[in-house]
Amino acid sequence: MEASPRSLTSCTLGPLDQKFSWEQLSELEAYFKVEPYPDLQDRKIMATRLKLKEEQVEAWFIQRSLEEEMRPPLARLQQSALDGTSSPSHKALCCRPPSWKYRLIPINPPESSTSCLKDSKTVLISKTELTDEQFQKLRKHFETDRCPNEETLQAFAEELKLRKDLIRSWFITQRHRMRGYRRLFMRYYRDWKTSREYSTTRSFDRQKNSKECSQNDPGLPEALEALKRLKLSSGYQSRDGMSQDF
């Protein structure tokens, strides 16, 4: 029996007031281990199967990626070792839906002194929450500096009249989206290079380039004509007794 959206067996994803049952979280978590950055089609399939909106699925994967990035390297190695050597009963225990504390994200994260800001305790902020002027200024800075320091964030907060934690969250989210887009592009590029259409296009391009090189070489027609005259003058005959013509 499915848990109701407001039952105690569901939990909230950050400040978005989105509810997920334990069954939904289990499927999302299992898929995340296989593909942390699903494309739009995969997200729609998951949303249909889990009776969620595609935007909810996308938001969950973004925040789950932030959480995974902030895990210490040692913890990741220990988890990998457990996945490979644990008993079936222990693996089943570890595969239970994650605790609420990993799904709940406070609104006011602590300050960070690192130059490249990576904080899992962040607040999602979308383009719709920014004015056009605010969004354009942030995007322009992101093109040259994707990891602004604290001084830059404070300057943006004063200039744009926004909370610094919101600006920090915007940069973190953009970095994760860029990483996801790069993975999607590389996967598409690999599929394209192994496709029959790519092979046909490459063959056509080689033939076209060869023909253009022949047409663009001013000495080639004269050389062929001279070779023809030389063979005719030397009495070169083809197999049928006629002069070989080019």
Swiss-Prot record:
Main function: Transcription factor that acts as a regulator of embryonic stem cell differentiation during the preimplantation stages of embryonic development.
GO BP of this protein: blastocyst hatching; embryonic placenta development; positive regulation of stem cell differentiation; regulation of transcription by RNA polymerase II; stem cell population maintenance
Organism: Mus musculus (Mouse)
Swiss-Prot/TrEMBL keywords: Developmental protein, DNA-binding, Homeobox, Nucleus, Repeat, Transcription, Transcription regulation
Compartmental location: Nucleus
Molecular-function annotations in GO: DNA binding; DNA-binding transcription factor activity, RNA polymerase II-specific
GO cellular component, one term: nucleus
InterPro entries: Engrailed_Homeobox_TFs, HD, Homeodomain-like_sf
Family according to the record: Belongs to the paired homeobox family.
DNA-binding region, residue range(s): 22-72, 129-182
Name this protein carries in UniProt: Homeobox protein Crxos
Motif (Nuclear localization signal): 163-177
Record-linked SUPFAM superfamilies: Homeodomain-like
Organ and tissue specificity: Specifically expressed during the preimplantation stages of embryonic development, between the four-cell to eight-cell stage and the morula stage. Expressed in adult testis.
Top-rank taxon, per record: Eukaryota
Gene (name only): Crxos
